[in-house]
Amino acid sequence: MRTEEFTPKPNMALGKYRHYKGNFYDVLELACHTETHEWYVVYKSLYDSKGNPETWVRPYTTFTETVNIKGTAVPRFQKVTD
């Protein structure tokens, strides 16, 4: 394996996050795509998913980006401190 092809693992706290739409999720792990070497966030919904998937993956860059809500930039996901 050639490690020079991999980008460093992002420094991201695991645990509870709130999505900008209001639902809560538990970030379980960061995973690296086998082909692109892009980092992904593996997270699980902390609400009744009503038959929808409970565990999700999203590119790290998308998970940590800001979104524009009524002219205000807000984090897509915000770390929650208990």
Regions found by a protein language model. Give the residues of each.
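Mixed-charge, low-complexity intrinsically disordered regions
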Residues: M1-D82
